[in-house]
Regions:
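The feature captures the beta-strand-to-loop junction immediately N-terminal to the Walker
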Residues: 33-35
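Catalytic Walker B motif of ABC-type/P-loop ATPase nucleotide-binding domains
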Residues: 156-160
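ABC-type ATPase nucleotide-binding domains, specifically the catalytic core motifs of the NBD
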Residues: 12, 30, 68, 93-112, ...
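Conserved ABC transporter NBD signature motif
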Residues: 56-64, 76, 109-114
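Helix-to-loop junction immediately C-terminal to a conserved catalytic motif
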Residues: 48
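ABC ATPase C-loop
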Residues: 148-149
Length: 234
């Protein structure tokens, strides 16, 4: 479904990614793990068109992502839930969800998509008239994910969905990821909580200093001495 080859990217004179090769197959959940500053968020921004790579190729179901304007990438079936959620805090849950249904296909199926989101996240139906900024961190994450799902994506990008949340809420967020997976959606998730994310993905990539250092199934990554020593405290 998603294919990155030899991707270099950065900010000004600073290079953040070096020769990234990454694949996500339809129906998979794939994790990207690594320390702060490794390039994980840059990777997500490159895929969603917020940053243009300096070199390499990105294809989504055969379509060239790099020749697609950023505001049209959602039409390819890619939806991005950014780190820290980026909701409109003074708008209601309903209005935030509407923001995700701006492409024509999503507008045509608005009621159907809204029902899908409310089935996944019943709490959002209860809170639909509440201002998003007054909800708990976990509820805001539900809303941010729901907004992305309103576009009817084929691939959902989740950037640090547990960031800044209390431990109990972190557990709830990963339960949300399991529900999304059960719906059949393909997921690429960036996460620092290595132990938790490896429980919900099929495969994972380890990025350090902008380079992929290791990759494998979740079981292989959990058994990797590199991962255990650096990220699992074993």
């Amino acid at each position: 479904m998603l294919e990155l080859r030899s991707v270099d990217a950065g900010y000004g004179s600073f290079q953040a990614l070096f020769g990234i090769d990454l694949d996500v197959k339809a129906g998979e959940a794939v994790g990207v793990i690594g320390p702060n500053g490794a390039g994980k968020t840059t990777l997500m921004r490159v895929i969603s068109g917020l940053i243009r790579p300096r070199r390499g190729s990105i294809r989504m179901e055969g379509a060239d992502v790099l020749t697609t304007p950023p505001h049209r990438i959602v039409n390819l079936g890619i939806a991005h839930v950014p780190e820290n959620r980026r909701l409109f805090p003074r708008l209601s849950v309903d209005d935030n969800l509407k923001m995700g249904a701006f492409i024509s296909d999503a507008r045509a199926k608005y009621a159907e998509r809204l029902e899908f989101v409310f089935d996944l996240f019943p709490r959002m139906k209860e809170r639909r008239s509440q201002m998003a900024g007054t909800m708990s961190g976990g509820e805001q994450q539900m809303c941010a994910i729901g907004r992305a799902l309103m576009s009817g994506p084929k691939l959902l990008l989740l950037d640090e969905p547990s960031a800044g949340l209390a431990p109990l809420v972190v557990q709830q967020v990963f339960e949300l990821v399991k529900r999304i997976r059960a719906s059949g959606l393909t997921v690429l998730i960036v996460e620092q909580n290595v132990q938790q994310v490896l429980k919900v993905v099929d495969r994972a990539y380890l990025i350090e200093a902008g380079t992929i250092r290791a990759s494998g199934t979740s079981a292989e990554m959990l058994a990797s001495s590199t991962v255990k020593e650096a990220y699992l405290g074993v």
